[in-house]
């Protein structure tokens, strides 16, 4: 079974949101995936300056885990750690989550670059994740 870990990383490389698909990932494996994601942040920064696209595709690999990235205009990073390569599904996932993220930014009660704690946002990301993965 393939697992997908999705993270939203803030401007100061602080985690804003994290979710795993399916939810049955062991805690030990979660820490390894967080370590892999953190290690790829410098690579994301390099790719941002080389491309005009928000979707950076697969930027790095670690063993069987591939890391795809999407960077917003405000330099918020979306990372997806995955084993299977399905570019269309990954790009569509990023675009739909980006739309949700923009709605969060429009919320007057949300502080920019702070962790996202909205249960509605979480439920919608889960729904999008099950749709594509």
From Swiss-Prot:
It comes from the Eukaryota. The keyword Transit peptide does not apply. Keywords: Cytoplasm, Endoplasmic reticulum, ER-Golgi transport, Golgi apparatus, Transport. One of its GO terms (cellular component) is perinuclear region of cytoplasm. Belongs to the TRAPP small subunits family. Sedlin subfamily. Part of the multisubunit TRAPP (transport protein particle) complex. This is Trafficking protein particle complex subunit 2. It comes from Dictyostelium discoideum. The gene is trappc2.
């Amino acid at each position: 079974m393939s697992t997908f870990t999705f993270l939203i990383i803030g401007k100061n490389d602080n985690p804003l949101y994290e979710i795993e698909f399916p939810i049955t990932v062991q805690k030990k494996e979660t820490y390894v995936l967080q370590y892999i994601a953190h290690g790829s942040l410098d690579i994301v920064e390099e790719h941002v300056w080389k491309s005009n696209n928000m979707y950076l595709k697969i930027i790095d690999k670690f063993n069987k885990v591939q890391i795809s990235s999407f960077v917003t205009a405000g330099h918020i990073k979306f990372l997806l750690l995955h084993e299977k390569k399905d570019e269309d599904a990954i790009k569509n996932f990023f675009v739909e989550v980006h739309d949700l993220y923009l709605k969060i930014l429009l919320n007057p009660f949300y502080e920019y670059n702070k962790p996202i704690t909205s249960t509605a946002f979480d439920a919608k990301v889960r729904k999008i994740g099950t749709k594509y993965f």
